[in-house]
Curated annotation (Swiss-Prot):
This is U1-lycotoxin-Ls1a. Coiled coil: none annotated. It comes from Lycosa singoriensis (Wolf spider). GO terms for cellular component: extracellular region. May inhibit growth of bacteria.
Length: 19
């Protein structure tokens, strides 16, 4: 449980670093 939330958080973090 919570894998979806963690995945979304990682996606947002990656987008932040790439931006």
């Amino acid at each position: 449980a919570g894998i979806g939330k963690i995945g979304d958080f990682i996606k947002k973090a990656i987008a932040k670093y790439k931006n």
